[in-house]
């Protein structure tokens, strides 16, 4: 943080130069985190619409990037959720083309809405010292690449 402040004092409004002081992996993490936020927001809305159905087929949800086009989406409800999310966030898929830092440009992808949780084990259940009259659980499981444990845990404990 101090290096960035110093850089900006010396170089005025060269924000791209200041951001380049942050390691590349960390800068990419910022972009990918925002894409994951969008994915989760879209997924949550899709599941709210389909709540109460006995069975929802697994579909692919987009990870919004510069090459995303709504025309690739066959499900009209999903298409509307994506458009609504993009409008609410005041973004365009083209915003993921970062001309001042092309190394951060992200094309996006698709990810399954549902994934298989393998080897789920409850290792321990005990009193929660932070939340009176509550229990805590220590669990273990394996997820496929690009799936988030937080999402799986939220689903398990709903």
Short names for language-model regions:
Residues 1-158:
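Non-catalytic, substrate/partner-engaging modules appended to enzymatic cores
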